[in-house]
Amino acid sequence: MAVFKVFYQHNRDEVIVRENTQSLYVEAQTEEQVRRYLKDRNFNIEFITKLEGAHLDYEKENSEHFNVEIAK
């Protein structure tokens, strides 16, 4: 399993505005699994990136909201 960081907007019908971008962390095997896990939410997904090594460690140490959801 890997941890993915998802950048998204809360409303799929609105134009993406950088200042409104939110993020969340999802543990899954693939990016596709992350997208399936989030498909029922009304998110406008901007970008999904896999976190590994030093990048993952940095997010754990410096993100106030580092709560990982587990994709099922």
From Swiss-Prot:
Q: Which reaction does this enzyme catalyse, per its entry?
A: RNA(n) + a ribonucleoside 5'-triphosphate = RNA(n+1) + diphosphate
- Per the UniProt record, which EC number(s) apply here? 2.7.7.6
Q: In its UniProt record, which GO terms are filed under biological process?
A: DNA-templated transcription
Source domain of life is: Bacteria
Q: Which InterPro entries match?
A: RpoY
What Pfam family is a match for this entry?
A: RpoY
GO CC term (a single one)? DNA-directed RNA polymerase complex
UniProtKB keywords: DNA-directed RNA polymerase, Nucleotidyltransferase, Transcription, Transferase
Q: Name one GO molecular function term.
A: DNA-directed RNA polymerase activity
Enzyme class, UniProt record, top EC level: transferase
Instruction: Describe the protein's quaternary organization and the partners it interacts with.
Output: RNAP is composed of a core of 2 alpha, a beta and a beta' subunit. The core is associated with a delta subunit, and at least one of epsilon or omega. When a sigma factor is associated with the core the holoenzyme is formed, which can initiate transcription.
Question: What is the annotated role of this protein in its UniProt record?
Answer: A non-essential component of RNA polymerase (RNAP).
Cited HAMAP family:
RNApol_bact_RpoY
Q: Would you identify the family this protein belongs to, as annotated?
A: Belongs to the RNA polymerase subunit epsilon family.
NCBIfam families noted in UniProt: PRK13667.1
**Under which name does UniProt file this protein?**
DNA-directed RNA polymerase subunit epsilon
